[in-house]
Amino acid sequence: MLPSGAPFARAVRIDSIGDDMKFAFVFPGQGSQSVGMLNAFADLAVVRETLQEASDALNQDLGKLIAEGPAEELNLTTNTQPVMLTAAYACYRAWQEAGGPAPSIVAGHSLGEYTALVAAGAIAFKDAVPLVRFRAQAMQTAVPVGQGGMAAILGLDDDTVRAVCAEAAEAGVVEAVNFNAPAQVVIAGNKAAVEKACEIAKAKGAKRALPLPVSAPFHSSLLTPASDQLRDYLATVDVKAPQIPVVNNIDVAVVSDPAAIKDALVRQAAGPVRWVECVRHIAGTGVTHVIECGPGKVLAGLTKRIDANLTGASVFDPASLDEALKLATA
């Protein structure tokens, strides 16, 4: 552990970064949180400052919640969304503090898109924290608890999963909502329709059809009421043109106009996360290294499955930060 307030030791020199290297940063969404996930960074001043800024923005001690839990409270979506934004941004600031190279492009998975916009300078962190708290509340209230569901379908291609959803639609709304990796698609909708889709997927040869422990059918059209509320809230938020290109989830596009950024966030709440396409877009810009900032290492694993030519790493504690920085001199 570092002495309280001590500067973080640089693992590499900035001027040693290879000229042929180009970095992208990606930020995780819900599901990667865990009690104690920032404890290894506890003595890093910039991490403590980030936690304090978030706590001040919500008038809630997020640092204590992250460090001590309980898990049941941490996993409430109204807490998870601001907590994951805060944790991922803290890891990004730790990278900056350590002298890591700046990204040439950024993206985030679902909630992580908000972290990407903060990292790119489009939304102030102090504004983003209450914004994602509101987003969480709107998403949770759009569909009563117990009426919606989500499931991961493994082993079927995208078109087959879409066909499965169409066949199961007689039982209610069910849609493909997260395209996370080749042959890894998440579906969401009415609980009965999701269960029906899982049965059909298995009959069509899916390796697995796993119900997910979530409180709402995130990114499905059932969350349109949440999108409407989010549009009204975003009208009050100051959004600037990003200083770094941000690839959005809903269109797999880089936009700089603040109104277009807000519109993409509104549609994203009730629309699909096209993560495979986002990573391929990033690769198409000449990026060589994709660094995931935040706990869980989920996106680093997906990156390798999407494009084996990309070098991936995660930053979630001092040891992983050192390893990621060493990639810059490899």
Regions found by a protein language model. Give the residues of each.
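Short, charged, surface-exposed secondary-structure boundary motifs
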Residues: 321-327
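FabD-like malonyl-/acyl-CoA
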Residues: 17, 21-161, 212, 289-319
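Non-catalytic positions within long, well-ordered alpha-helices that form the structural scaffold/packing
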Residues: 96, 202, 283-284
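Short, Lys/Arg-enriched N-terminal segments with co-localized hydrophobic residues
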Residues: 7-20
